């Protein structure tokens, strides 16, 4: 089961992908930039017991 959300805020494009396989942990992926003059924000959140946060900003 996978849910995909796409939201356009101003000139920033944000994509949220949530997949819930029975044998895999839930993954949330946020942040995709389609325009070159905008800020890129990427955040990857993994399982609660395996916390992994990644933030990338590119002007």
Curated annotation (Swiss-Prot):
It comes from the Viruses. This is Protein B3. It comes from Human herpesvirus 6B (strain Z29). The gene is B3.
């Amino acid at each position: 089961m996978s849910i995909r959300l796409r939201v356009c805020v101003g000139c920033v494009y944000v994509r949220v992908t949530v997949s819930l396989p029975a044998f895999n942990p839930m993954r949330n992926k946020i942040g995709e930039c389609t325009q070159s003059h905008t800020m890129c924000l990427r955040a990857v959140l993994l399982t609660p017991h395996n916390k992994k946060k990644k933030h990338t900003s590119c002007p």
